[in-house]
Amino acid sequence: SNMDGVGTFSMAKVMQEHKMMTVITKSTTVDQWKAAAGTGLRMQSVSVCTGTNVMFDPESSDWQTMKKVLEMFPDVKMITVDVANAYHQNMVDFIKKIREAYPNKVIVAGNVVTPEMTEELIINGADVVKIGIGPGSVCTTRTMTGVGVPQFSAIVECSDAANGVGGHIMADGGCTQPGDIAKAFGGGAHMVMIGGMLAGHDE
């Protein structure tokens, strides 16, 4: 998960030994990326992360960081576009912008919980759509806005939609024990993102 305390380089160096990806938090600076290089970190095993602020501010810090990281480390193959609730036109426009700028990168985008929006993001350039609004251990979106769908139901519906348009989904949130990961895969998820299960543990 790209949550603070989990989406770190120290975590990535452990996770890469188990063939797992780590999404580095979008608050990570270019200097921190530089410092991580040469420490045994495999850049193919991490994703750079950005929000959509650049749609409002061309000098957005996470966008500028992402561009610099991808220039310095071409082995970083994955870009994660992370917003709490992806149900707005700016998100779709941003995915188009990213795909045009980086045609050969794997783009992960989210979060959504409905098949229609899953299809929309994939059709407009996302390779993988993150599924989950509310189930995460530190997520407050359902509480604050009332938006959300039970996680297993969302996975089942969205995986079917993604398969229909040649994309993939990543189940994000709600895993508190190993069985939850198995349920997500059983429901059709191609990948599962975990955060809370790793939070507070030594790498």
Regions found by a protein language model. Give the residues of each.
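Active-site entrance/lid segments in N-terminal catalytic domains of soluble metabolic enzymes
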Residues: S1-H168, G196-H201
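Active-site capping/gating regions of soluble enzymes
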Residues: G167-H201
